[in-house]
């Protein structure tokens, strides 16, 4: 894997900097690195593809070295260099695609394609290594079963979940009380509602709670908390739990009371925030507990009083909500996030070449299913294919 990254980094630099008119002295280091790669690769043969519709391709290396000059690089020099560079780039692209289509239930962190296994051989250790990539650094750590650490922005840590629970209901669904939520990506939105606006609740107050367990623990997280859940702020028709009917939800938004956010790790509370909104931090957690209250306003203008009558029909439904968004965090496991295209890159290649469903990844690389059942085997394979995708993205956009 280090060889693949180092070759790709050198190729990217060579493609970007070896241009007509450039002084040789300005690019001599890159040219010497590329020549080292040529010397190491010459005389070797590789084969890629042969899975799904990814075609089998054979690769042979027999290239002359790029020469030296005291002057600027001319058109002939650049054309010769480009021909060699483009062949190497095409080779790396196919090695990456081959690797991204393969998976293994055992030791999925290790190279799975014949080409990348061959590149891992001792003869290629002469290539000048560049391990500056976060993915390569963490791949090396994971390969040695040491602790890894990925920095994510808006990590897709929450499997998609959208549902509701009713603490009070009737066959007519005309006086409901309960909780509804939407968990997806890096965001939780949860709303508590009471058609009667807590008229018969103790102290005219309803208590709500929403607990979310993460599939992987996060550390040093920066989080935003807002006293609102905008996705539940407009009228909607909702299917009943048994699917036999539908019911109408017509929210009127109140501010939540006694808001408490707890971050837990292995059942132990690590951080607690009460009535704190905006930006907060959480040190280390695998569970989030949100609790909040809906309190019937003790004093209301006639217009507000008309919204919340003391008897049916309840045409407007008192609602309070919270939004929790993970803006950034560190995780030992690889995840998809908003800053990178690794999941899309891997999925696109597997779809384009009709890669059959293997023993590890779900059909279509369905992220919700993948993260819901994030086994060690999936973690190893995902880190490997994401590392390869990060290498490919340097050369192929």
UniProtKB/Swiss-Prot annotation:
Metal-binding found in the keyword field: yes
Region (Interaction with the inner capsid protein VP2): 62-73
InterPro entries named among the record's database cross-references: Capsid_hemagglutn, Rotavirus_A/C_VP6, Virus_capsid_a-hlx_vir
Compartments (UniProt record): Virion
Pfam families: Rota_Capsid_VP6 (PF00980)
Keywords: Calcium, Capsid protein, Intermediate capsid protein, Metal-binding, Ubl conjugation, Virion, Zinc
GO molecular function ontology, one term from the record: metal ion binding
Record bears the keyword Calcium: yes
Binding site residues for Zn(2+): 153
Main localisation: virion
Domain of life: Viruses
GO BP, one annotated term: fusion of virus membrane with host plasma membrane
Residues bound to Ca(2+): 266, 286
PTM notes: The N-terminus is blocked.
HAMAP family in the cross-refs: Rota_VP6, Rota_VP6_A
Function (record text): Intermediate capsid protein that self assembles to form an icosahedral capsid with a T=13 symmetry, which consists of 230 trimers of VP6, with channels at each of its five-fold vertices. This capsid constitutes the middle concentric layer of the viral mature particle. The innermost VP2 capsid and the intermediate VP6 capsid remain intact following cell entry to protect the dsRNA from degradation and to prevent unfavorable antiviral responses in the host cell during all the replication cycle of the virus.
Subunit composition and interactions: Homotrimer. Interacts with the inner capsid protein VP2. Interacts with the outer capsid glycoprotein VP7. Interacts with the outer capsid protein VP5*.
Name of the protein in question: Intermediate capsid protein VP6
Organism: Rotavirus A (strain RVA/Equine/United States/FI-14/1980/G3P4[12]) (RV-A)
């Amino acid at each position: 894997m280090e060889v693949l990254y180092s070759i790709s980094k050198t190729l990217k630099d060579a493609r970007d900097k070896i241009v007509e008119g450039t002084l040789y002295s300005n690019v001599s280091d890159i040219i010497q690195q590329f020549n080292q790669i040529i010397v190491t690769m010459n005389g070797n043969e590789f084969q890629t593809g042969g899975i799904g519709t990814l075609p089998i391709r054979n690769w042979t290396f027999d290239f002359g070295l790029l020469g030296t000059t005291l002057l600027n690089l001319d058109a002939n020099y650049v054309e010769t260099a480009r021909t060699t560079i483009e062949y190497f780039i095409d080779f790396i692209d196919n090695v990456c695609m081959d690797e991204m289509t393969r998976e293994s239930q055992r030791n999925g962190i290790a190279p799975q394609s014949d080409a990348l296994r061959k590149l891992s051989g001792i003869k290629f250790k002469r290539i000048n290594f560049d391990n500056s990539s976060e993915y390569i650094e963490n791949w090396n750590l994971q390969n040695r079963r040491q602790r890894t650490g990925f920095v994510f922005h808006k990590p897709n840590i929450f499997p998609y979940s959208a549902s509701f629970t009713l603490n009070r209901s009737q066959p007519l669904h005309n006086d409901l009380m309960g909780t509804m939520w939407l968990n997806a990506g890096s965001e939780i939105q949860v709303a508590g509602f009471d058609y009667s606006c807590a008229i018969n609740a103790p102290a005219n107050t309803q208590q709500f709670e929403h607990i979310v367990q993460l599939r992987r623990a996060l550390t040093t997280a920066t989080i935003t908390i807002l006293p609102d859940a905008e996705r539940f702020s407009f009228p909607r028709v909702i299917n009943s739990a048994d699917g036999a009917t539908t019911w109408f939800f017509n929210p009127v938004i109140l501010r939540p009371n006694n808001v408490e956010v707890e971050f837990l790790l292995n059942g132990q509370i690590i951080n607690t925030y009460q009535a704190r909104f905006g930006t907060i931090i959480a040190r280390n957690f695998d569970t989030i507990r949100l609790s909040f209250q809906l309190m019937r306003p003790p004093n209301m203008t006639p217009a507000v009083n008309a919204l919340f009558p003391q008897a049916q029909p309840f045409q407007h439904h008192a609602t309070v909500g919270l939004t929790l968004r993970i803006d950034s965090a560190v995780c030992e496991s690889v995840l998809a996030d908003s800053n990178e295209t690794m999941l899309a890159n891997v999925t696109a290649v597997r779809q384009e070449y009709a890669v059959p469903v293997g023993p590890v990844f779900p059909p279509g690389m369905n992220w919700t299913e993948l993260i819901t059942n994030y086994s060690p085997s999936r973690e190893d394979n995902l880190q490997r294919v994401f590392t390869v995708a990060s290498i490919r993205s340097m050369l192929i956009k």
